Amino acid sequence: MSIEQKINGDVGTLILGEEIDLDSSPTVRENIKDLLTSTKIVEVNLANVSYIDSSGIASLIEGMQMAKQQTGKEFHLVDVSNEVMKVIE
């Protein structure tokens, strides 16, 4: 799995690639947590994700919950790939 962080003002973008599974989920959670600490808005770009399992979905839900617990924070999924959408739906 590849992970890239970009920060532009109050917006932190986490660009994920390839697979989000049991092995990579802790890293995804930590990156989301880091961006929530340093920015107001976190966007998780899933355009390049070809596979996600239940632990990957759980990491995204935990990110959303972390954002909700912090006043003024936002969490968004952007450019969700078809493969990820099939799992979410």
Residues of each region from the PLM?
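STAS-typified acidic loop motif
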Residues: 2-30, 47
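Amphipathic alpha-helical interaction surfaces in cytosolic regulatory modules
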Residues: 22-89
